[in-house]
């Protein structure tokens, strides 16, 4: 499936791209377009006026989890981290958010969007595994 979003990926768009590939569409392809250039045959995310974007107090990652009925508690734990890294509104306690924000901002400064998505897939795989083990153990893994 063809997916589109805005250029200049940051944490929410990078997290959504990871979620799409890992849980929604393993064959996804990504393009980066202006808000007024969404192709009819593409699914847009994290763009103004589209279904898979910020709604109410939720970031796009949270919206996608709900839209695709993904109920994995680790994904919802990641959603809290992504939300705070993206919005910094203190809605959740997420110690990892500041570090994730810094890493994604730095990668945005040094990589084109397609490369950034590839690199951040590893970041989100690692964060997912860390939070999965933390939930299983009831504490941060060592």
Can you say where each PLM-predicted feature lies in the sequence?
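Short amphipathic alpha-helical segments and their helix-coil junctions
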Residues: 1-3, 105-106
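Conserved, aromatic- and glycine-enriched, well-ordered alpha/beta core segments
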Residues: 2-6, 13-69, 73
């Amino acid at each position: 499936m063809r997916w589109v979003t805005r250029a200049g990926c940051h944490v929410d768009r990078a997290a959504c791209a990871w979620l799409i590939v890992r849980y929604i569409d393993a064959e996804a392809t990504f393009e980066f377009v202006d808000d007024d250039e969404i192709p009819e045959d593409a699914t847009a995310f994290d763009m103004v006026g589209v279904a898979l974007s910020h709604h109410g107090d939720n970031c796009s990652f949270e919206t996608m989890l709900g839209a695709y009925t993904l109920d994995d508690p680790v994904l919802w734990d990641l959603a809290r981290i992504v939300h705070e890294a993206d919005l910094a509104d203190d809605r959740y306690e997420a110690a990892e958010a500041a570090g994730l924000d810094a890493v994604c901002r730095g990668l945005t400064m040094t990589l084109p969007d397609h490369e950034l998505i590839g690199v951040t897939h590893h970041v989100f795989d690692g964060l997912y595994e860390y939070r999965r083990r933390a939930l299983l153990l009831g504490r941060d893994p060592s």
